[in-house]
């Protein structure tokens, strides 16, 4: 029997949303919270007071400058060089302090570096001792091997010379090998 399957098609419908643009997106739908309202009620008087004080200070400075300007004009040959000298002195003190602070921080860095390096020095010294001992052992073994090689070659040469010395018997015409070792 044939298996008949029916394929069902499903259709999904998505509702279209209207675009809410403009300034409404930036504000919450429910309105300001109680903390925001409290911040406005406290912040506006404090901000206004500080702004008023700043304005009064600016006005006082301008009025004081207008009143003092004739005195500055009269005493300018004395005031300008004095202000220049005071400015240079202050610059010198500030530069001296900055250089001193830089030197102090540099010394602190060097001391911390030495302190950190001092913690690793015993480990490095121990490692260097082991490497030096290994190298000395290696050099000793190589020297021993070289000495043994030289001794073996000298023995071979001595052996070759002892057996190569031939005694000629001229009457018989034969060569006799003579051992020249002394006992």
UniProtKB/Swiss-Prot annotation:
Region Polar, residue ranges: 1-39
Tell me the leader sequence span. none
The portions of this protein that span the membrane are 37-57, 66-86, 87-107
Question: What Pfam families would the database entry show?
Answer: Oleosin (PF01277)
Recorded GO cellular component terms are: membrane; monolayer-surrounded lipid storage body
Q: How does it sit in the membrane?
A: Multi-pass membrane protein
- Give the region (Disordered) as residue ranges: 144-183
Tell me the superkingdom of the source.
Eukaryota
Tagged with keyword Ribosomal protein: no
Q: Which GO terms describe its biological process?
A: post-embryonic development; reproductive structure development
Q: What are the boundaries of the region Hydrophobic?
A: 40-113
Record localization: Lipid droplet; Membrane
- Reply yes or no: does the keyword Transmembrane apply: yes
Question: Which key words are in the record?
Answer: Lipid droplet, Membrane, Transmembrane, Transmembrane helix
Q: Which PANTHER family does the protein's record reference?
A: OLEOSIN (PTHR33203), OLEOSIN 5 (PTHR33203:SF61)
What functional role does this protein have? May have a structural role to stabilize the lipid body during desiccation of the seed by preventing coalescence of the oil. Probably interacts with both lipid and phospholipid moieties of lipid bodies. May also provide recognition signals for specific lipase anchorage in lipolysis during seedling growth.
The UniProt similarity line reads: Belongs to the oleosin family.
> What's the protein name?
Oleosin 5
């Amino acid at each position: 029997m044939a298996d008949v399957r029916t394929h069902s098609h499903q259709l999904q419908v998505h509702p279209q949303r209207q675009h809410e643009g403009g300034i409404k997106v930036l504000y919450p739908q429910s309105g300001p919270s109680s903390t925001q309202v409290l911040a406005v009620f406290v912040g506006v008087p404090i901000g206004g007071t500080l702004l008023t004080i700043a304005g009064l200070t600016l006005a006082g400075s301008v009025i004081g400058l207008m009143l003092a300007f004739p005195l500055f004009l009269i005493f300018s040959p004395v005031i300008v060089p004095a202000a220049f000298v005071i400015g240079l002195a202050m610059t010198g003190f500030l530069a001296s302090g900055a250089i001193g602070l830089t030197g102090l921080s540099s010394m602190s860095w060097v001391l911390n570096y030495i302190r950190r390096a001092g913690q690793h020095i015993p480990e490095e010294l121990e490692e260097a001792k082991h490497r030096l001992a290994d190298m000395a052992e290696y050099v000793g073994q190589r020297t021993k091997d070289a000495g043994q090689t030289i001794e073996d070659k000298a023995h071979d040469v001595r052996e070759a010379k002892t057996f190569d010395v031939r005694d000629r018997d001229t009457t018989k015409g034969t060569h006799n090998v003579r051992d020249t070792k002394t006992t």
